[in-house]
């Protein structure tokens, strides 16, 4: 990855407006895997300007044209599959087997689903009363993604924007920028017009705030903490943007005494540990009927003790 200190704006890898940088660390060993540039208000302004300009033409493309681009995006994503998996192994410490089967594979699985959805989408529908329902692209979208499922979240935000004729600016988590920048290369190779997709790295207080407040961004999509989601909502309210949020929370499983305890507790504990316990829907709590509490405790302890921790570079089902 040669472009860690650059941003992808207007179809080109460009130098940032400022010289501020930060280290990207492998959390499994604290080794530095790269130095990434941090963006500023000026970088966001540059990205929004070209995204707004690109929207004028890209929003008028046909569904057939956008489907062809999505299919080419899938081809290039499959070609860069291992690069994406290895990037997430390093930047977030995901075991390589899981990085392939769950993390990188999400980029392809979600793409297949959105291709199917776009195929079925009727952009113009005549209602029973004679009215015409038109489905049109929203405009320029600001997309902010987290570090725990980097490509999964990028795919869930970027692909539907591209599929529906929107243009976008992506700010990935500053802790997992490498996979996002590889994905920018994928989009570039797939042949998307300049300015349709743009990437600016940076911290939320600077780049995220600039995006949420920008008058020419029509929609913000954010996945992350409740604290940051509140700020995105408040900042977006100044220009009455459409906002979608997926925020933090805890996800308890409820266990009653008539459940299959061996099966259900094993499933709960393993799901909690999946992705090293870093999934937003990890069942980190069990709400247990008192009559079976002691038995559940024994099963949970046994399953947890059997889970192994090892080097993410090694193949296997360890965490």
Q: At which residue positions do the language-model features occur?
A:
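Rossmann-like NAD(P) dinucleotide-binding subdomain of oxidoreductase/dehydrogenase enzymes
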Residues: 123-263
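Residue-level signal for inorganic ion chemistry
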Residues: 30, 66, 88, 111, ...
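Proline-centered turn/helix-capping motifs that create local helix->coil transitions or kinks
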Residues: 112, 116-125, 305-312
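Long amphipathic alpha-helix in the N-terminal Rossmann-like dinucleotide-binding domain
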Residues: 49, 71-82, 96-121
